[in-house]
Amino acid sequence: GWRKPERVKVKAADGITDLYGVMYRPFDMDSTRKYPIIINVYPGPQENFVPQSFTLDDNGNESLAQLGFIVINVGFRGSCFTRGRNYHCFGYGNLRDYALADCKFVIEQLANRYSFIDLDRVGIYGHSGGGFMAAASILTYPDFYKVAVAASGNHDNNIYTKWWGETYHGVKMHEKKVGKQDSVMYSFESKIPTTIELAKNLKGKLLLITGDMDINVHMAHTIRLANALMQANKRFDLMLIPGADHGLGSPYYVNLIRYYFIENLLGQRLDNVDMSSID
């Protein structure tokens, strides 16, 4: 009963640039029904997240689809260097927002193309930069995304590693003439927009996940976003995983994400206290 994932080609939000991705469907899919769609994201910009070779379960997409979802991976403008300098530099100076419009437009195009996609039930999730993007997406387009899971997200790149922000967002240089000899003093500024600034926009269901031993993206990123959501009087969910570093992937973590989408996109409440494996 195995079905091959489908390669898809769509346009970026500019209506010109071609974007490429992969779509996964339930093996027992009924094409006369409507299915929620979930996009698994990672915006780069240092690598391409879209599978380019065969594996049994690309980034967990295949197994997630079998629970009753359409699952997609798509590469966005700015996501990698392999398509040339202009493509890769699209996000320079816009590190928070550059992939968001493409992502939304991709889902809208696929819903136009395939009648089985339900645009009223759209989910998004990602890890690390993907967690950053998932949170930014549901806070930027709160009427479009109904559910988001943001794991280990670098939600405030002003406290992330400087090489990341300065490389991919850029640094502004200011000149100021000083003294009688018109000497020039230079100052540098790197201020990157954050998801924290968007917290007041939340309407859907948002799950934040972080490990308390993450030495790559410190848990402070998630705590800052959680605090902003609380200050905005928003309901959200938070999971702190004890002893976990940046690379999450335990069965508990995987099933936590599955449970969240099943309950909030499929409307199936799972009341068992035990975190059973979902196959």
Language model regions located:
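Active-site-proximal cap/loop segments of hydrolase catalytic domains
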Residues: G60, N73-D279
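Non-catalytic accessory segments flanking enzyme active sites
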Residues: G1-R33, P51, T55-L56, E62-Q66, ...
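Conserved long hydrophobic alpha-helices within structured protein cores
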Residues: I16-D18, P36-Y42, D102
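Short substrate-entry loop that stabilizes the transition state in hydrolases
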Residues: M29-R83, F132
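Structural beta-strand/beta-sheet cores of well-ordered domains, especially the beta-sheet scaffolds
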Residues: E6, L19, I37, L67-I70, ...
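Hydrophobic residues at beta-strand termini and immediately following loops
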Residues: V8-V10, V41, V74, I241
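Flexible, active-site-proximal loop/turn residues at the rims of small-molecule/cofactor binding pockets
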Residues: F27-D28, G44, D143, N154
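Short hydrophobic segments within beta-strands
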Residues: Y24, N40-V41, Y125, I209
